[in-house]
Amino acid sequence: MNLRNSMAHGNYQEAGLMLDRMDRKDVYKKKDAVLLNLERGMIHRVNGDYQQSTLFFQKAEDDIEANFTRSISRAAASVLVNDNVLDYPGEDYEDVYLNAFKALNFIHLNDFDAALVEARRMAYKLENMELRNKGFAETYARQDSLGHADWTPGKSNIQNSAFSHYLSAVLFAKTGRPDNARIETQRVFSAMADQQAAYNFKLPPAQE
């Protein structure tokens, strides 16, 4: 049974042991540190070890930020590097949702203030994602003197996340900040109205 099958069948302890064996055999190279820590964070989470899970998610988040900074520096310096030797930078959704999992971990640990910090960090990343990617594309476009590629970033509305607003609303309410909770609740309905294709059910009245 492989790692994915172990996870799918709920054999989380076996999945953890399997991941340890894969790490010892260098299946995960140094450049795959983000991926390895994401895997470890998720396995510890589903095993109920929320502190260890948060630790590995934090390591992944730190590496994602460092790898992104290095990639910008390479682009600005016109340094071309084989993708196979680059550190895995993490996908945008991985960078965002690791904060969601950290928030849920802190909820399990009854640390609602820390959970709120993660929920707000998730919202911050989403709100700045389009701006960040635009800057990244512009940097590469300036270095592509031959115009080999179209570096125009695509359009998306991912930054308006109903889930991040909902999580923030619940945590603001839980930590005694009803005004903030009300604002975030309004944003939930706004986000769902903006992305109706993603929600195939009728929305309840906002006042509920």
Q: Where would I find each of the regions flagged by the language model?
A:
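TPR-repeat structural position
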Residues: 12-13, 50, 112, 178
